[in-house]
Amino acid sequence: MAEVGGVFASLDWDLQGFSSSLGNVPLADSPGFLNERLGQIEGKLQRGSPTDFAHLKGILRRRQLYCRTGFHLEIFPNGTVHGTRHDHSRFGILEFISLAVGLISIRGVDSGLYLGMNERGELFGSKKLTRECVFREQFEENWYNTYASTLYKHSDSERQYYVALNKDGSPREGYRTKRHQKFTHFLPRPVDPSKLPSMSRDLFRYR
């Protein structure tokens, strides 16, 4: 157990070092540095071994991500991303990992996959923590949050690609999104372990 605690204490230091080292440098200007740091962090967040997340207080949050269209975002083991109206669904329990001020990655607790967005603006679940899995979290005036890709945006207008869910729960391509659309507005909702299925409850407790 001491070894596990040491690993996550090291992760705590890594994340803090990542935040202070990155500073205000745009991600696009430091791809090599960012990729190296993401690799180090990803290596310490491997799925499957019991862990004590007390060391990550304030850095790692477990939430559901509720879209203004009425769906919770889910990340499935096969890499697909979709929305569900079911509260506390198995694949809708997510880990929010703070990488720097305003920069986060999101990972499914059950699937172990990171939320990613490719160059076409499509959402997917990634086994690796890459630059496609880093999003800028912004608090909007209506108390909702938006999550913009830090890697892809419109080349002509510089308009960002946002995480979004359509009115039927399907993922909306990032190139079709705008900041003030309700498709892009999300609320991170707290997780109540007592409402989770028994299998997911065990994962929530031990991972």
UniProtKB/Swiss-Prot annotation:
<dbReference type="GO" id="GO:0043410">
    <property type="term" value="P:positive regulation of MAPK cascade"/>
</dbReference>
<comment type="function">
    <text>Plays an important role in the regulation of embryonic development, cell proliferation and cell differentiation, and is required for normal cardiomyocyte proliferation and heart development.</text>
</comment>
<dbReference type="GO" id="GO:0005615">
    <property type="term" value="C:extracellular space"/>
</dbReference>
<feature type="modified residue" description="Phosphoserine">
    <location>
        <position position="111"/>
    </location>
</feature>
<dbReference type="GO" id="GO:0008284">
    <property type="term" value="P:positive regulation of cell population proliferation"/>
</dbReference>
<protein>
    <recommendedName>
        <fullName>Fibroblast growth factor 16</fullName>
    </recommendedName>
</protein>
<dbReference type="GO" id="GO:0030334">
    <property type="term" value="P:regulation of cell migration"/>
</dbReference>
<dbReference type="InterPro" id="IPR002209">
    <property type="entry name" value="Fibroblast_GF_fam"/>
</dbReference>
<dbReference type="GO" id="GO:0005104">
    <property type="term" value="F:fibroblast growth factor receptor binding"/>
</dbReference>
<comment type="subunit">
    <text>Interacts with FGFR1 and FGFR2.</text>
</comment>
<dbReference type="GO" id="GO:2000546">
    <property type="term" value="P:positive regulation of endothelial cell chemotaxis to fibroblast growth factor"/>
</dbReference>
<dbReference type="InterPro" id="IPR008996">
    <property type="entry name" value="IL1/FGF"/>
</dbReference>
<comment type="similarity">
    <text>Belongs to the heparin-binding growth factors family.</text>
</comment>
<feature type="glycosylation site" description="N-linked (GlcNAc...) asparagine">
    <location>
        <position position="78"/>
    </location>
</feature>
<dbReference type="Pfam" id="PF00167">
    <property type="entry name" value="FGF"/>
</dbReference>
<keyword id="KW-0339">Growth factor</keyword>
<dbReference type="GO" id="GO:0008543">
    <property type="term" value="P:fibroblast growth factor receptor signaling pathway"/>
</dbReference>
<dbReference type="GO" id="GO:0070349">
    <property type="term" value="P:positive regulation of brown fat cell proliferation"/>
</dbReference>
<dbReference type="GO" id="GO:0005737">
    <property type="term" value="C:cytoplasm"/>
</dbReference>
<dbReference type="GO" id="GO:0008083">
    <property type="term" value="F:growth factor activity"/>
</dbReference>
<keyword id="KW-0325">Glycoprotein</keyword>
<keyword id="KW-0597">Phosphoprotein</keyword>
<dbReference type="GO" id="GO:0022008">
    <property type="term" value="P:neurogenesis"/>
</dbReference>
<keyword id="KW-0964">Secreted</keyword>
